[in-house]
């Protein structure tokens, strides 16, 4: 599959930033897809999150620990990555 995650890379260890009010921040994940018109369905730890068209970038707020991120296009092609939130 030619599609790939721009961020996060496989097995990345990520520290979420703190917001100005001290609350937990977000991670922004991004996918490069070979078809610019594709619809992407995003899943974090096998739970559907959202879908994107045109710009394949979303923000997530996962709990500390290991996570699996999977993107599925409208044709059923999938690409996955694993990352760790510290």
Q: Where are the regions that the model predicts?
A:
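Soluble, non-transmembrane domains of envelope/secretory-pathway proteins that act on or interact
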Residues: 1-86
